[in-house]
Design a protein with these regions (language model features):
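Single-pass alpha-helical transmembrane signal-anchor segments
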Residues: 2-23
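Amphipathic, interface-forming alpha-helical segments with heptad-repeat character
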Residues: 34-45, 49-177
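Prokaryotic Sec-type signal peptides and long signal-anchor helices
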Residues: 13-16, 172, 186
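A general, composition-driven signal for non-globular sequence regions
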Residues: 15-18, 30, 119, 178
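Feature targets compositionally biased, intrinsically disordered low-complexity regions
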Residues: 4, 44-46, 183
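Transmembrane-cytosolic junction motif
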Residues: 17-37
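Assembly-interface segments of oligomeric complexes
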Residues: 177-189
Length: 189
């Protein structure tokens, strides 16, 4: 009789572990990617979900809310050879959890690099005066470039905001900039 109690207790514990491993509750605005034996099987949406224990595993957990990403400040050179330090923030959202998991090894680094290279390209085509006036154009161009490329990564760029635009002149270029400025002042208009 004593053995029956121990066996019943062990079976109860095994059943409890089985139930805990089977039932998964995904929070609202989340998506979990399930792999079955190492291969993509399904994406679990919010609510109560059932998986096969010891065969299925939760490989990735993604938040589907809007995510702010601080893009590191970088130096950009305008068409008139003025250096700007530009600091911005990118807002994005995961639209496809499966693609976000398998489309890129690191989608955050990928969209950060894409935002930086697009920013350098756009500012390189403008003169200094235009960069301050055309902030909205710069922001829109960056978001469009991210949307084009990031669709394969399961990510959508929502908006990009330039936080800070700072001009600075390096010591080596200071003399040249002063000469150009004085030459412009001496030429009659």
């Amino acid at each position: 009789m004593e053995n029956f109690g121990i066996v019943a207790f062990v079976l109860f514990i095994v059943a409890l572990v089985f139930i805990v491993k089977t039932i998964k509750v995904v929070p609202q605005q989340d998506a979990w990617v399930v792999e079955r034996l190492g291969k993509y099987h399904a994406t679990l949406g919010p609510g109560l979900n059932i998986v096969v224990p010891f065969v299925d595993r939760i490989a990735y957990k993604h938040v589907l809310k809007e995510i702010p990403l601080d893009v590191p400040p970088q130096v950009c050179i305008t068409r008139d050879n003025t250096q700007l330090q530009v600091d911005g923030i990118l807002y994005f959202q995961i639209t496809d959890a499966m693609r976000a998991s398998y489309g890129s090894s690191n989608y955050v680094a990928a969209i950060t690099q894409l935002a930086q290279t697009t920013l350098r390209s756009v500012i390189g085509k403008m003169e200094l005066d235009k960069t301050f006036e055309e902030r909205d154009h710069i922001n829109t161009t960056i978001v469009n470039a991210i949307d084009e490329s990031a669709a394969n990564w399961g990510v959508k760029g929502l908006r990009y905001e330039i936080k800070d635009l700072n001009t600075f002149i390096l010591a080596a270029n200071a003399h040249q900039q002063v000469e150009i400025h004085s030459h412009r002042q001496s030429v009659p208009h």
